[in-house]
């Protein structure tokens, strides 16, 4: 019995110790011992033996939960490891796919360039063979004629043979001249082929911009046509309302004249009293009619101006051009004015009708001559009303005329096309920007072409292309600026662009020694990629950061070291800052001047050598003919 109790006590001690170690961890290892656990268990046994079984159950539950948590932690660790492995595999697959795509694009571009070069070479070879064949046929004819002349006696047909030989000699010289011109044209065409490629790219971009502008103009025109239709509909409604107002005014005037005739008021007095300078000392019974007629003439002067047929026709003629434009003003106020005029005329008509009824009786046929006299007397005042113009019409007309300016898109586009034709007619020189990554090539190009600087530019992938026109020695010079990527994986692409370059802008960072040390590698790459010596401008960029780095005791590249390295390779040298724009244009101008000078020298040497070779050939032909 005692052994069982002791064994159970030891088991409980182990359970308690294991549970507390799992819960407390390192703190249990540092401070909790088995003796303390046994002491705690003995105290519980002595104080309250009934708590032993619940205590043991609690300990077992603790152990079970600890095991479950440890199992879950292991599962989570396994899952995290699997996810990391999967992500690494996917990343490697993406890198391989990107490299494959880059390689495929590079191979395709190489094949295209090779195919184009082979086609051009085949055409030149075919032309050369054709011309050589023609010359050989001519030579054979000459030899044949010489043999015939030897066989024939010297006395027979000497004059004819000399003439024939002279003609053949002239023809031979003409053919040689044409051959020289053809070879010269081929050389010029070959030099202009690159310019035409760049021109094609520019024209495609310009055509896309023109299509976008035309699309915008089409949308604007459709919206303007819709607005014109709305304005024409409103104009027709206004003309209809004017016709109604005219008929209402005629009826109102006739009834007014009749009522005045009933009250034994003369037309002259009525008109004089209705004028702005009416007599304030008139009799009291006529005060109502004078005030009514004066207010009527003041409120309806606008409608009277539109009731006259001539004035209405002039108004319609003047409004025809305005219907083709949108003034940009709302027409809601016009509708409100029309409704107010209709309401006023309706009220005046009712007031006049009530006045006529209060006076009693209708106008007789004998009143017609008086009415005619009144109309004749009132023609002057009506004519003045018919020539009425609203205040501010001149100002509004000037505003509308100033806002209705002709659309200058076509003229601007024509000017742009003319300027483009002027630019593209010149030779374009290809300048390649090279250097390590993050030396500021893209910022340099943006400052040169757009006069802008962005501090958060992204890395160039592959090659970027810009055009820039500069005045070099008083002449417009077109530059094709190719911004190459500086990363290691894009070096092969950059090297391929050196092959047809006319000049190189080799940039390094004055605050980064590694970019300066890699300049030698870039120069070797340029020399390997070109079949001739081209000008190189060594540019120390980010010169504005040198003072800051010197203040922080960081190593920078001095201008003396850059100039010394440039002298070693026979290159130009300049320090620039794309941030503040210092020496950016000057560096490109110096390089463009050197490129232009060297290209002109090469062209002159090629033409001279070509002329010399043709003269040697002609001399050999003459010697052959004379022999």
UniProtKB/Swiss-Prot annotation:
<protein>
    <recommendedName>
        <fullName>Ras and EF-hand domain-containing protein homolog</fullName>
    </recommendedName>
</protein>
<dbReference type="InterPro" id="IPR027417">
    <property type="entry name" value="P-loop_NTPase"/>
</dbReference>
<keyword id="KW-0547">Nucleotide-binding</keyword>
<feature type="binding site">
    <location>
        <begin position="438"/>
        <end position="443"/>
    </location>
    <ligand>
        <name>GTP</name>
    </ligand>
</feature>
<keyword id="KW-0175">Coiled coil</keyword>
<dbReference type="GO" id="GO:0005525">
    <property type="term" value="F:GTP binding"/>
</dbReference>
<comment type="similarity">
    <text>Belongs to the small GTPase superfamily. Rab family.</text>
</comment>
<feature type="modified residue" description="Phosphoserine">
    <location>
        <position position="266"/>
    </location>
</feature>
<dbReference type="InterPro" id="IPR001806">
    <property type="entry name" value="Small_GTPase"/>
</dbReference>
<keyword id="KW-0342">GTP-binding</keyword>
<feature type="binding site">
    <location>
        <begin position="541"/>
        <end position="544"/>
    </location>
    <ligand>
        <name>GTP</name>
    </ligand>
</feature>
<comment type="subunit">
    <text>Homodimer. Interacts with the dynein-dynactin complex.</text>
</comment>
<dbReference type="InterPro" id="IPR005225">
    <property type="entry name" value="Small_GTP-bd"/>
</dbReference>
<comment type="function">
    <text>Binds predominantly GDP, and also GTP. Acts as a dynein adapter protein that activates dynein-mediated transport and dynein-dynactin motility on microtubules.</text>
</comment>
<feature type="binding site">
    <location>
        <begin position="578"/>
        <end position="579"/>
    </location>
    <ligand>
        <name>GTP</name>
    </ligand>
</feature>
<keyword id="KW-0597">Phosphoprotein</keyword>
<dbReference type="InterPro" id="IPR050227">
    <property type="entry name" value="Rab"/>
</dbReference>
<feature type="modified residue" description="Phosphoserine">
    <location>
        <position position="272"/>
    </location>
</feature>
<feature type="coiled-coil region">
    <location>
        <begin position="55"/>
        <end position="245"/>
    </location>
</feature>
<dbReference type="GO" id="GO:0003924">
    <property type="term" value="F:GTPase activity"/>
</dbReference>
<dbReference type="GO" id="GO:0048471">
    <property type="term" value="C:perinuclear region of cytoplasm"/>
</dbReference>
<dbReference type="Pfam" id="PF00071">
    <property type="entry name" value="Ras"/>
</dbReference>
<keyword id="KW-0963">Cytoplasm</keyword>
